Structure formats: C-alpha cells, structure tokens
C-alpha cells in the first residue's frame, strides 16, 4: 500500500515538475534571471561586475558578481603568499542558490581556514561537460587544487538537457566513435 502511494503521488508529482520545467524553458522568451550572459562555448556564464537581487518565493538575497564572473569578492589571478589556492567548480549548489554569500560552503571554508584561499567558480545549470570546458579558464588562476562539487541529482542530465536561462549550451551525444561532440 505504501509503495503504491509513493508511486502514484510522490513519483508522479516529481515527473510533472520536470515536465513543467522543460515546458517553461521551451516557452521562455527571455532570461528570467539577469545574472547570465550568452557564451558561444559554454552556452551561458555569469555576468561580469553585476549586482542585483535574486528572489524566489522562499528567499530574497543580494547577488554580487565580480570582474572575473564569479559570485565572490574581487580576486587576483596571482595567488596569495603562504596560502594554497582551491578552485571549486559546480552548479547552482556551488553558486549558492537560496543562500547569502556568507552562507555558501566555499565562503565558510575560506573564512575558517587561514591556510587556504577558496575561489568559487560555480555557475547554475552547469554539469560535467561545462566543468570540463570551464577548466582552461580556471587554470589561469593557478590553483593548487581543483574540486568539483558534483550533484548526483542533476549533473548527469545536464549533459543532455542543453537549454537553460533561454540559452543553448553544449551537450553530449553517443556515437560509434565515443567522444564529446
């Protein structure tokens, strides 16, 4: 009985949510969030030097994007002396949807450890393919460590669901010769 309830009400509501999300992206005529710019390789990327409010029913936070297109304080490409630099890439979880800058896990690590400088390269909607394509830019910051905050809930599907924020992004296809196309 419990399994039937879960399949009928919980599983079907999740399926409906996904369908309506896809429908919303297909019918969107513009980017509902003003934090992103079109990018010919990545599909979209964070804006440079942007400040605005990100609001949904459950939260309202100020968002500041620096000159390097990171939701972070201004950073130099030159490393600080006596600190290891950690670059973190990821999707909306890393970017910090729903939380203030000070509440993001990368900011907490950076604030509570004097031996590390943590740079947050998170971009909402990114997945493994865009992490790979983003890597050349991240390496220009000379990180000692590069971490990927991988979200099992959607990072695999982000490789094939290739439209976000009214922008098309890179996607993968399977072919006889296994490679990224």
Summary of predicted features, one role per range:
Residues 13-112:
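Membrane/wall-proximal cationic-aromatic binding patches
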Residues 11-43, 129-181:
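Interaction-surface signature
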Residues 6, 94-95, 154:
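Active-site micro-motifs of SAM-dependent methyltransferase domains
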Residues 87-89, 119, 146:
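Conserved beta-strand elements of the Class I
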Residues 1-7:
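Hydrophobic membrane-insertion alpha-helices, especially the h-region
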Residues 2, 89-90, 148-150:
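Active-site flanking residues adjacent to catalytic metal/cofactor-binding acidic residues
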